[in-house]
């Protein structure tokens, strides 16, 4: 599982370098899509196939399920790292995540995925957790 956080700049073509510790995780291809809290999720292809299997089984009669699938699946973009370990982030996904050419980007590991954040949104998300940390009971059995 990928973990850690790394800062890079988005180049003038909308590309970002995948950090060396994460490259093996996505070496066979990846899918970029909209994530929660205004970030992008990056899934390796094998993980994405499992997610697709779960999405196809969501009930069409459930409006919330349809809305989530629309949000999550319609924004998906399959790609690969180039020879310099960069990934092109399509303009609609850059817009969604608030990523600007030349701007600072945080790439963070998470269980089963990577997350790509604008630096500003990343620190806002971290500050929100610090301002209102989860109750110890919610973490029972997970930490410690």
UniProtKB/Swiss-Prot annotation:
Q: Which SUPFAM superfamilies match?
A: AbrB/MazE/MraZ-like
Against PROSITE patterns, the record matches this protein to: SPOVT_ABRB
Q: Which GO terms describe its biological process?
A: negative regulation of DNA-templated transcription initiation
Compartments, as annotated in UniProt? Cytoplasm, Nucleoid
* Record's subunit section: Forms oligomers.
Q: Which family does the entry's similarity section mention? A: Belongs to the MraZ family.
Which protein are we looking at? Transcriptional regulator MraZ
Gene (UniProt)? mraZ
């Amino acid at each position: 599982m990928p973990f850690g956080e790394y800062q890079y700049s988005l180049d003038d073509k909308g590309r970002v370098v995948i950090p060396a510790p994460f490259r093996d995780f996505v070496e066979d291809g990846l899918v970029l899509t909209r994530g929660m809290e205004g970030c992008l999720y990056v899934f390796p292809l094998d993980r994405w196939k499992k997610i697709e299997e779960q999405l196809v089984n969501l009930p069409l009669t459930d409006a919330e399920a349809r809305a989530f699938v629309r949000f999550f699946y319609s924004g998906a973009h399959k790609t690969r790292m180039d020879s310099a370990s960069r990934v092109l982030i399509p303009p609609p996904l850059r817009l969604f995540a608030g990523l600007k050419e030349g701007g600072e980007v945080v790439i963070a590991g998470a269980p089963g995925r990577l997350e790509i954040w604008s630096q500003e949104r990343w620190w806002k998300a971290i500050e929100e957790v610090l301002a209102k940390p989860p109750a110890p009971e919610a973490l029972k059995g997970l930490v410690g």
